[in-house]
Structures are given as structure tokens and as C-alpha cells.
Amino acid sequence: MRLNILNDVVDYFVLTESPFTVSGNEKPLYYQENKDRFGKFNDKIVHHVTEEIPNDFTHLLEKTKFHVAYKNNDPYGTPMIDLPVRFQRALFNRNNSAFGIEKAGATDEDLVITSDADEIINPLLLQDLEWFNPSNHYVAECRAFYYKLNFLYQEDWMGSRLCTWKHLKNTTIDQHRQDHQKAHKIQDAGWHFSFFGNEEDFKLKLASYEHTENNTDQVTSTASEKIEQGLDPLGRTNKLVTVPLDDSYPQYVLENQDKYAEFISAWN
């Protein structure tokens, strides 16, 4: 979906993946194993594989290329070397994506958009860049949807980050991710489609990412109920609201509702 939505407004898709989750479990290289399914986009995809995610990060105490110095504090005042190893892995994996951007041949003036796979910036923003100031960095405030394309979460999501390659390569990708309070915010700038799939997909997502505090029996045992009833995946108080598919959605989604019918809930 995101490739179709953004194909006409980007030069390259830099796709970074690893054979390990940040929890340390082995996982497939999904793009590499399904490359034939991406035939339309393969000429635009720059694939970067982080072959190994360390268990010990003491060799990164001092700053190295594209990586932060792990002796420094995170935004909450904890030295990064003292964080749980799953967070250190996530930090490493995210920052390592910059090598893929370098591989794509980015120049200092190029606009670089960094996103999680489930974050899609609005392509209309990229058709006219008069608003973009190369001295600034930006965050796209996105509408968030869980389970279904039209199960709307009632708080915006801080999604894709935008800046020049010159700016990004002299900081780190994770720093841009964490410093969204300092970024210039672009309102209604995209979509965050997350926790899509069935009950097993729900559980796999929670088992794979760094926030293992959410991977509890209390959360996962009610996965099916949450999906069916539109309840917050992590047990927060906000209930999801079913909304109509209208012109606030990507044109590609509106034109392919039959293709995504299983992910659309009736709103009438």
C-alpha cells in the first residue's frame, strides 16, 4: 500500500530489515524472500540488511558514523548504554538505516523521509515543497488507525520525520525520532495503519518490538476481542471510532476498496 501511495513522489524507497527482531529472535527477511511480489517497485527499492544486531554495545560508547554515542543520555536522562538491551538494539537498527540512505546516493540537499513501515506521509505534501525549509526538521502528525483502515484512534500519531540528508547524517535517525517536541509539526500529514492482521499477527507484533512491557497475558489474551470490538490494542482508555472512507484518505485506498475489503468496517 505505502509503495503505491508514494511511488510518484519519491526517487527511492530505502528499505532496511534485519534477520533478528529487537527482542533478539530470528525472523525472515520479508522483502528478500518476497521480492517477486514487489516487481513494480524493485528498481526504486534500495535494500539494506543489518546482518547482525549486537548484544553488547560497549564498542559504541563513543560516537561512530551514523550512530549516537551510547555513553550519552537518552531524552529521559538515562545513559543509553544502561538501557535494556532491546532498546539498545532498536536504537542501533534504526540508526543503521542511514547506511542504506547513503547507498541510495543521497546528496546534502535531498529531502529524506524516515518512517516506520506502518507510517505513510501524505503524498500531496511532497508535490509542492515551498513550505520546506532546509534548515528545519519536521514531523508529520498523522491520523492513527488500528486493525481496520477506518478504525480511528482519537489521538494523532507523530509519524514520518523529514529533513535534508545534510541535516540527518550529522545527527542520527533515532535522534530525529525522539526529538519530535523540537520539530516543526505538519498537521494532518499522513496515516498510521498499525496492528493489521489477525490475532496471531497481533501477538507477533508485541513479541517482536522493544516495548515488551506491553507483551503481557493481560494484553494478548484479549487480542481477538480488541480486534472485533475496536478496543485500544494496549488497553488504553481511548476506544476506536469507525469513520467513513472519504477524501481524507489516500486516493489509492479509495480506488482499491475491494482489494482491502477485509480491512474496512461498515460505517453506516
Q: Where in this protein do the model-derived segments appear?
A:
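Histidine-anchored nucleotide/phosphate-binding helix
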Residues: 1-6
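Acidic donor-binding segment of Leloir-type glycosyltransferases
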Residues: 7-82
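Catalytic-site signature of metal-activated, phosphate-bearing donor transferases
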Residues: 55-110, 114, 119-268
